[in-house]
């Protein structure tokens, strides 16, 4: 589709090249599911969905159902954003979004969909949405969690161990976690 001329645009935004950015947050954390966020910088519109923690627990984890669910979530988010015909779709290079990239290319056309490193507001808003999700569980994340990933993991683990019923909020499918989840 040809880009409209300035004279044919009803708003400045209509003539501006728009971009959708898709990011994830929480994949490497022990608690909750994973947030998939979508952000359009030109309008500052942000939306997200959560891939439930059940996808990171057996038996779904072994089947890698989280990859298919991430693709479904990404497709729903893009569709609800009503992208223009030539609007670029940038997707985080995270492994969890690999299937999403392929599905988006099939649905919206390969040249429009690019795998990139997501930074800035898209990343910040997706991370903030994830932090809100874990706070809803009653967990208070450490302030410097990004800089101190190992400390953050063990802080989450101690929180789970204080109350065995919290285990239902943990991503127990990761093989390396099994050695830490013992009660």
Predicted segments — roles?
Residues 2-183:
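RNase H-like, Mg2+-dependent phosphodiesterase core
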């Amino acid at each position: 589709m040809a880009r409209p001329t300035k004279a044919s645009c009803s708003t400045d935004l209509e003539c501006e090249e728009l971009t959708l950015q898709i990011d994830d947050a929480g994949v490497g954390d022990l608690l909750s599911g994973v947030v998939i966020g979508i952000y359009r910088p030109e309008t500052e519109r942000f939306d997200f969905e959560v891939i439930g923690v059940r996808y990171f627990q057996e038996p779904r984890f072994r089947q890698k159902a989280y990859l298919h669910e991430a693709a479904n979530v990404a497709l729903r988010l893009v569709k609800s954003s009503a992208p223009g015909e030539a609007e670029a779709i940038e997707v985080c290079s995270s492994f969890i979004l690999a299937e999403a990239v392929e599905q988006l290319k099939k649905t919206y056309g390969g040249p429009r969909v690019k795998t990139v490193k997501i930074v800035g507001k898209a990343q910040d808003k997706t991370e903030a949405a994830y932090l809100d999700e874990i706070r809803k569980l009653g967990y208070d994340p450490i302030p410097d969690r990004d800089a101190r990933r190992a400390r953050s993991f063990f802080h989450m683990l101690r929180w789970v161990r204080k109350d065995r019923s919290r285990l239902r909020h943990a991503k127990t499918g990761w093989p390396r976690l099994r050695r830490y989840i013992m009660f």
